[in-house]
Amino acid sequence: TNEIYPLNPIIGLIIQSKVNVSIPLSNKFGKTKGIFQPSEGSYVLLNWFGGGHPSQTVSKKILKGKNKHFRATLAASEIIFNGAPLIIKNPWNCFRISSIRKLLPKAKFIWLKRDIRKSAASDLESRYLTKKNPNKWNSATPSNIEKLKLLPPVHQVIENQFEFNRSIKANLKNIPSKNWITLWYEDILEDTNVELKKISSFLNRDYKFNTNKNKIKKKIRNISSEEQKEINKYVNIHSKRFKENLY
């Protein structure tokens, strides 16, 4: 859907609804293998919200004239999949919560937090693998990106992750608590079934998963030990500011 039908995602969703395939959930920086696997829907969202940087400023609202197509696509998806909720996981949406809330008053939000030391390390690794340069941003960018560019990469990624979390927290404050839930990535790794049950309950869906956590592979970060130490050091120095983002 994302790669072939970004302008008309319903075509891809209809095709997928007719094909019975096994869907492994493993991914690498939001990328999965196979045309029917989960996707961050970057190109689909680009069509609706645009792109550009800083994304917190220029890509936080739906584009003019796209409102109708956005709503129609989601409504059609609900029909195609017999009322199943459409879950969209994409880092750019960290800055679109307010806009999405206005477009979809009944929308629910899942805030999946992660220890900032780990999320920063993942952010840095993604720069090496996708941009071949630790100084180049891999994904969404906060409004203060020019200020963050003055920092070394190992500090940039920490502050970048902090801005994501700060924006999410600020926007969720304006939404009734029944419409959002907070989970920790670390808890999902520890007991996947328990956390998935929480999500299912939140979305008013029956829980039908049975995950063997022994099969979950713990990834070794492809960054230097010096970089990881510097990330840990910086977070420790500013631990008071980052305390809500530490697991």
Give the positions of each predicted feature.
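PAPS-dependent sulfotransferases, especially Golgi type II membrane carbohydrate sulfotransferases
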Residues: 124-247
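PAPS-dependent sulfation machinery
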Residues: 2-86
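Soluble or luminal CAZymes and related metallo-dependent hydrolases
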Residues: 62-70, 89-92, 156-164, 191
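N-terminal cationic-hydrophobic initiation segments that often serve targeting/anchoring roles
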Residues: 78, 101, 172-173
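Short, solvent-exposed loop/turn segments at secondary-structure junctions
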Residues: 4-6, 92-95, 115-119, 125-128, ...
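Conserved phosphate-donor/acceptor-positioning beta-strand/loop module used by diverse small-molecule
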Residues: 89-91, 100-125
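Short catalytic-loop micro-motif centered on adjacent basic/acidic residues
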Residues: 85-89, 182-184
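A structural signal for short coil/turn segments at secondary-structure junctions
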Residues: 81, 104, 175-176
